[in-house]
């Protein structure tokens, strides 16, 4: 390829020669062209520059003043205020220093070795790489913060001393200077605090971005056993919960935690210098509180670690429920899974409640500790015989106020690091799991791809031995735990192949055809390095590989993007690929041709269409080595032949191809054939295997054709018609291919959408929303009592300050010091009791709300129509159960209580100041108007940004979930870097919302700090010059004003944070209100028949379709058009037709997964719309096209309701030819199955287990949708005879492409282009000029060629 490119390039001398020869002739034309081009280019460049300017972060080009005041974010704030909403496209990009491709380089697995014997290596490395090396400003600002904390009480002392002077010694200028110093210290201290938050946010965002990237990159490298351990749900929890814990810690506590002890020591020295040795009493109280705080912190951390484990379990089961919802609905197993999730939720809530009790204890300690220090210090000071002086009391109170803030913050920092430790362990453990070792050796000029003496196993022994995870430590079912433990030990050395030799000639077709479960897929996975190689060598594997998995991996994007898979579009070659993969005619069934979104996992496509899209991707990649695992199993014979001729033997010719297939009619075309038997490989050419090994392929093919008897007299007449049909088909293809373009109209692009945009609430969070939240957790009376307790508690707190002024003034002259002390301590005790009551009430509301919301959410999701799951990615839905429920469980009620506390503290504080000095009411009213207006402007932008942030989180989870399901395909195509790039883009979109939100918070904080400092200045001026200058109350007003400044900022933040957390509630609440299935048009008006009247329904198994039409969504073309047919009791009906014709839709209609848009379906004369869905689905049986198993055991997958004894299960396992396999497993029926049977059973074995599940239930009416498509011919024949013998009294609809499976049916239904074109006895159809005859004729022609 490179050589050809070099040939086509012209040398520089040739190029310049050509120019000189043509220069004179074309000079004028070139000048004209250049002029035209230059105008177009200028316009295009202007547009590009404008676009870049709009998306570029305004901070990059902001002035110094704009950066200090965050004026650069004003434009976005105003835009949000005017629009009353924001979209993600309105938000500018994050600056380069926050982009994922930059931050992800800070920590890499190469730099960072996560060893289990190294404690907290992740935390340590983050400190080194993110703070010491990248954000040293944090340390400098923290120094300034300590300095201003120490200066504030000293300035206040000077101010108080000034007020104590006699009037003749006071100077107005000096007084104003002191007021100015109070303003300056207040504003500078607050400003330093804000910049500490800002740089902490930058560190936090970088840590979040980096860890998310690191976890995603690791997920793309997981070994197979690690994939079983860490499914998509667990990795989702790592990102949505554990990474968030890291982010929160490094935002607010990362540097503070080191400076706080020094800050506390300096403040204590100041206190002791002010009150003497009495300060040591306060110090002693602080020292005593540390071990108590430590105990509560450790217990909270332990419970949090347990909580995360139970959350993992619940989210994993919920993820399995969401991913398997189509099958769960068909089997009517919703209640089974809901009970399982409910049990796990109960365990989670139990831990949440126990953790809540310790949380209550630590909250009480945090809120009373500082007050207790103050009381102990001042009481000791008084009892020591010291007179309570005004300057001493209020300076000490100011110092103790700073200590109070520290004593509140320090435990939170400690608790946050204690909660960080479990997250640190979990992330480190994940990052230390074994990675896939794709140790393939490329040999130049090799003639074969080979395995020499290869030994392979699925299980990673090291992982099993070192993995002592606690997933089962807390299970109630000890028996299950014991079973799982035994199984792990037994299966550690479960080798798939031992000392095998394999070869595939370069540039040739190698076919692997063996019985079901023999190891065909395992051999393919060995060649691409997906299973562990213990011994031997793999040689000759090229660098560029294409791979089609047995269960196709498709992304929730357009059909085109799934085929291109990151490659550039070559429109002509692309059209050839569509034709070769027989996808051209399918495009007419899609609403927007190849631009149509096909949904998560290709939900919008049939099984055959999925396989062909996967095959088209492999072909389009133009790789040297193509591995295909059963790409022909779900397509009809005509399409299979087309794919083999045009694709596998056509466009793929001269490439190295390995094809796994049960389509044995193609065996004679193979250059090399591989048969796997009992773990050994027999290989050679068709002739070698026939002559040397005695394998009679011809007799197998002949047996397969024995039932397909054709009337020879009609055969010749059809050949002419076939040729005419082929010509028409080619003309039709040409017409469709002409419609395929590089770019499409906007109208068609709109039609292409399958996934709906995520719902988002607009405008402010209404009072009704808050009311709804509290409705779930309390009554109106209970809520009123809670609010009242909060208000009384804060009034009592303020009363303690008033009492201090009374004490210093000795207002009650006749009373002793003991009286003042007793009253002071009594106020403290009452305050303590009220704190306990108010937080107990709040905790109860939060717990009840959490429980009820989750229960309603999972019930609502379980009843939602299947179209909801088709149009919403699983990651988006799962985000409600992980991130949003986590917010409601752990954060919502904290925010609520803090917001209430700050609001009431501000109200009580302002009334206190106005009571002391009524003249302050005027400036307060003016400043309140400013505050209210600024807050309103800010609130809109930050609310909308947080909504955008929540919405932008879902694509991260959805994309992660998709990638976890397609790891082998991504790795085979070597697409890891592209997928990392896509994930980085998703992270950056989420991060830009977060960054803008933080910038907006800084914008308002700085402006509020200025307003707050102005309040301090005004109140201090009034206290000097209003006639109360010698009163303790005037000093109290200044002290109160100083405390209000911090409350104003905190209240503003907490109100917005609460509104942000309410966004999680809104999202959950919206899902709670989803419409239930069966409530669509034409259903509500019909009355349901009671279950009592349907006790033995269906008795006969008659089916009647009357003019049935089906549309999956409003944009789609009908999947079934005017279908009318009747099935009598016990009849066996075969349903055939081209892949994608609408066969599986018939099954979906019967189970009411999709409602008929027209017509009706009757079973035993009863319209199925009048039957309860659970009753309808529970009465029918199905073997789905895609086999689905849930995590559990063999037994629980066959009999989840525990209705049958072991003997019966073994009998049915023998029927489906699985008894031998399962009886050899160490725990037999109790052998563990992971989600969807991955690494435990082959695809064909999973199909047989699903068949067993259906047969043991023995329903009157059974639908078999390609039930044996992935099993070998002999097994299929055996099962066919078993069904014929045992299901004589059952009505069976069999959808199949393999005609030998359905040729003995009573009737054949032929579906073509969504219509029923034939419905007749197979013999009559074969002996007439029918479509079915042509299908049979075509298959026979292929197999006997």
Curated annotation (Swiss-Prot):
Q: Mind listing the GO biological process terms from this record?
A: slug development involved in sorocarp development; transmembrane transport
One GO term describing the cellular component: membrane
| Cysteine-cysteine disulfides | none
Q: Which residues cross the membrane?
A: 139-159, 172-192, 246-266, 268-288, 356-376, 402-422, 776-796, 817-837, 906-926, 1008-1028
The residues the entry assigns to the signal sequence are none
Q: Which Pfam families match?
A: ABC_membrane, ABC_tran
Q: Which domain of life is it from?
A: Eukaryota
Query: What are the alphabetically sorted keywords of the record?
Result: ATP-binding, Coiled coil, Membrane, Nucleotide-binding, Repeat, Transmembrane, Transmembrane helix, Transport
Q: Which residues form a coiled coil?
A: 21-55, 709-739
Question: InterPro entries per the record?
Answer: AAA+_ATPase, ABC1_TM_dom, ABC1_TM_sf, ABC_transporter-like_ATP-bd, ABC_transporter-like_CS, ABC_transporter_C-like, ABCC_6TM_D1, ABCC_6TM_D2
Name of the molecule in the record: ABC transporter C family member 9
Q: Which gene encodes it?
A: abcC9
Keyword Translocase in annotation: no
Organism of origin is Dictyostelium discoideum (Social amoeba)
Which GO MF terms does the UniProt record name? ABC-type transporter activity; ATP binding; ATP hydrolysis activity; ATPase-coupled transmembrane transporter activity
| UniProt record similarity statement | Belongs to the ABC transporter superfamily. ABCC family. Conjugate transporter (TC 3.A.1.208) subfamily.
Question: Where located?
Answer: Membrane
Query: Composition bias, kind Acidic residues: at what positions?
Result: 462-481
Disordered, as annotated region: 460-488
Question: Where along this sequence does the record place binding of ATP?
Answer: 1137-1144
How does the protein's chain sit in the membrane according to the entry?
Multi-pass membrane protein
Asked if the keyword Nucleotidyltransferase belongs to this entry, the reply reads no
Q: Which residues form the ABC transmembrane type-1 domain?
A: 135-419, 775-1060
Q: Where is the ABC transporter domain?
A: 481-703, 1103-1338
């Amino acid at each position: 390829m490179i050589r050809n490119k070099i040939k086509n390039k012209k040398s520089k001398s040739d190029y310049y020669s050509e120019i000189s020869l043509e220069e004179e002739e074309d000079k004028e034309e070139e000048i004209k062209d250049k002029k035209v081009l230059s105008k177009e280019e200028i316009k295009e460049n202007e547009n590009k520059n404008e676009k870049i300017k709009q998306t570029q972060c305004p901070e990059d080009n902001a002035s110094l003043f704009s950066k200090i005041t965050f004026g650069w974010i004003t434009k976005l704030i105003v835009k949000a205020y005017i629009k009353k909403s924001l979209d993600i496209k309105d938000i500018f990009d994050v600056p380069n220093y926050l982009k994922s491709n930059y931050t992800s380089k800070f920590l890499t697995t190469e730099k960072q070795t996560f060893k289990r014997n190294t404690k907290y290596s992740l935390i340590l490395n983050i400190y080194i790489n993110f703070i010491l090396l990248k954000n040293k400003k944090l340390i400098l600002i923290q120094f300034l913060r300590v300095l201003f904390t120490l200066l504030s009480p000293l300035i206040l002392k000077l101010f108080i001393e000034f007020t104590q002077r006699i009037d003749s010694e006071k100077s107005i200028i000096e007084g104003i200077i002191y007021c100015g110093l109070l303003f300056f210290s207040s504003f500078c201290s607050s400003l330093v605090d804000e910049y500490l938050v800002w740089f902490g946010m930058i560190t936090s965002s970088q840590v979040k971005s980096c860890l998310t990237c690191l976890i995603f990159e690791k997920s793309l490298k997981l070994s197979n056993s690690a994939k079983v351990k860490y499914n998509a749900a667990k990795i989702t929890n790592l990102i949505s919960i554990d990474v968030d814990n890291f982010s929160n810690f490094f935002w607010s506590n990362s540097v503070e935690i080191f400076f706080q002890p020094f800050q506390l020591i300096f403040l204590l020295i100041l206190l002791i210098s002010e009150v003497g040795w009495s300060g040591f009493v306060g110090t002693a109280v602080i020292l005593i509180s540390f071990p108590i705080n430590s105990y509560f912190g450790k217990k909270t951390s332990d419970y949090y670690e347990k909580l995360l484990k139970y959350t993992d379990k619940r989210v994993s089961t919920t993820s399995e429920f969401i991913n398997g919802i189509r099958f769960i609905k068909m089997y009517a197993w919703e209640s089974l899974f809901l009970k399982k999730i409910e049990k796990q939720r109960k365990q989670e809530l139990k831990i949440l409640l126990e953790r809540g009790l310790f949380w209550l204890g630590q909250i009480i300690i945090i809120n009373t500790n500082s007050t207790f220090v103050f009381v102990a210090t001042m009481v000791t000071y008084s009892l020591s015989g010291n007179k309570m002086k005004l300057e001493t009391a209020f300076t000490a109170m100011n110092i103790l106020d700073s200590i109070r803030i520290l004593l509140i913050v320090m435990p939170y920092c400690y608790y946050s690091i204690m909660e960080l430790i479990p997250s640190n362990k979990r992330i480190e453990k994940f990052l230390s799991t074994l990675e896939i070792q794709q140790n393939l050796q490329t040999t130049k000029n090799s003639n074969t791809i080979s395995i020499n003496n290869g030994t392979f196993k699925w299980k990673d022994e090291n992982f099993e031995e070192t993995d002592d995870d606690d997933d089962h430590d807390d299970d109630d079912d000890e028996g299950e735990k014991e079973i799982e433990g035994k199984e792990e030990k037994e299966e550690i050395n479960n080798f798939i192949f031992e000392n095998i030799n394999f070869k595939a000639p370069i540039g040739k077709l190698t076919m692997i055809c063996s019985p079901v479960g023999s190891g065909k897929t395992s051999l393919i996975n060995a060649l691409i390095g997906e299973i562990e190689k213990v011994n031997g060598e793999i040689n000759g594997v090229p660098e560029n590989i294409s791979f089609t998995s047995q269960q196709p991996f498709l992304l929730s994007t357009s059909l085109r993007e799934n085929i291109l898979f990151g490659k550039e579009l070559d429109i002509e070659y692309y059209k050839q690929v569509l034709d070769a993969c027989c996808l051209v005619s399918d495009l007419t069934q899609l609403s927007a041709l190849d631009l149509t979104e096909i949904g998560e996992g290709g939900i919008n496509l049939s099984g055959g269409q999925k396989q062909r899209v996967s095959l088209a991707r492999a072909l389009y990649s133009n790789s040297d080595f193509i591995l295909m695992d059963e790409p022909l199993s779900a397509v009809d014979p005509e399409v299979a032949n087309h794919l083999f001729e045009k694709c596998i033997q056509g466009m793929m010719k001269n490439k190295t191809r390995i094809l796994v297939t049960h389509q044995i009619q193609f065996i004679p075309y193979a250059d090399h054939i591989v048969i796997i038997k009992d773990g050994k490989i027999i290989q050679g050419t068709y002739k070698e295997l026939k002559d040397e090994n005695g394998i009679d392929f011809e007799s197998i093919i002949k047996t397969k054709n024995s039932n397909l008897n054709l009337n020879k007299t009609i055969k010749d007449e059809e050949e002419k018609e076939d040729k005419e049909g082929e010509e028409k088909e080619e003309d039709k293809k040409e017409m469709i291919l002409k419609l395929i373009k590089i770019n499409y109209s906007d109208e068609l692009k709109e039609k292409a959408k399958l996934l709906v945009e995520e719902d988002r609430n607009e405008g402010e969070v209404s009072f009704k929303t808050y009311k709804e939240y509290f409705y779930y957790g309390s009554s109106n009376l209970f809520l009123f009592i809670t609010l009242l307790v909060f208000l009384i508690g804060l009034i009592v707190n303020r009363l303690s300050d008033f009492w201090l002024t009374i004490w210093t003034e000795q207002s009650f002259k006749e009373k002793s010091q003991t009286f003042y002390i007793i009253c002071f301590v009594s106020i403290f005790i009452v305050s303590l009791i009220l704190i306990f009551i108010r937080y107990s009430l709040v905790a109860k509301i939060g717990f009840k709300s959490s429980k009820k919301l989750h229960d309603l959410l999972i019930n609502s999701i379980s009843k939602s129509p299947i179209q909801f799951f088709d149009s919403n990615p699983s990651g988006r839905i799962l985000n409600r159960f992980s991130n949003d429920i986590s917010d409601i469980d752990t954060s919502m009620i904290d925010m609520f209580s803090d917001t209430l506390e700050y609001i009431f503290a501000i109200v009580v504080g302002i009334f206190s100041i106005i009571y002391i000095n009524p003249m302050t009411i005027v400036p307060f009213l003016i400043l309140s108007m400013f505050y209210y207006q600024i807050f309103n402007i800010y609130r809109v932008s930050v609310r909308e940004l947080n909504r955008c942030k929540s919405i932008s989180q879902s694509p991260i989870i959805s994309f992660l979930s998709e990638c976890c399901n397609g790891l082998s395909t991504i790795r085979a195509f070597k697409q890891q870097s592209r997928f990392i790039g896509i994930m980085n883009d998703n992270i950056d979109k989420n991060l830009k919302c977060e960054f803008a939100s933080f910038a907006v918070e800084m914008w308002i904080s700085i402006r509020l700090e200025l307003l707050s400092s102005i309040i301090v200045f005004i109140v201090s001026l009034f206290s000097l010059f209003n006639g109360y200058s010698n009163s303790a109350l005037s000093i109290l007003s200044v002290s109160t004003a100083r405390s209000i400044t911090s409350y104003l900022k905190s209240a503003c933040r907490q109100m917005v944070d609460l509104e942000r957390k309410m966004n999680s509630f809104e999202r959950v609440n919206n899902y709670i209100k989803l419409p239930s299935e069966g409530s669509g048009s034409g259903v509500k008006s019909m009355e349901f028949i009671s279950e009592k009247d349907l006790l033995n329904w269906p008795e006969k198994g008659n089916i009647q379709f009357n003019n049935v039409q089906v549309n999956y969504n409003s944009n789609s073309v009908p999947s079934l058009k005017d279908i009318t047919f009747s099935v009598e009791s016990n009849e066996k009906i075969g349903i055939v037709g081209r892949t994608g014709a609408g066969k599986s839709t018939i099954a979906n209609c019967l189970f009411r997964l999709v409602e008929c848009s027209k017509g009706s379906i009757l079973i035993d004369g009863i319209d199925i719309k009048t039957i309860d869905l659970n009753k309808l689905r529970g009465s029918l049986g199905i073997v789905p096209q895609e086999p689905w198993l849930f995590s559990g055991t063999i037994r629980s997958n066959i009999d989840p309701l525990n209705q049958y004894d072991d003997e019966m299960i073994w009998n049915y396992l023998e029927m489906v030819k699985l008894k031998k396999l399962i009886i050899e497993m160490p725990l037999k029926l109790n052998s563990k199955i992971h989600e969807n049977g991955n690494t435990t059973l082959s695809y064909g074995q999973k199909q047989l287990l699903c068949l067993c599940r259906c047969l043991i239930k023995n329903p009157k009416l059974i639908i078999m949708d390609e039930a044996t498509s992935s099993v070998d011919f002999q097994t299929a024949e055996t099962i066919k005879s078993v069904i014929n013998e045992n299901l004589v009294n059952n009505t069976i609809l069999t959808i199949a492409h393999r005609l030998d499976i359905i040729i003995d049916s009573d009737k054949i239904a032929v579906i073509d282009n969504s219509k029923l074109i034939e419905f007749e006895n197979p013999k009559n159809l074969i002996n007439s000029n029918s479509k079915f005859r042509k299908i049979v004729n075509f298959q026979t022609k292929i197999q006997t060629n």
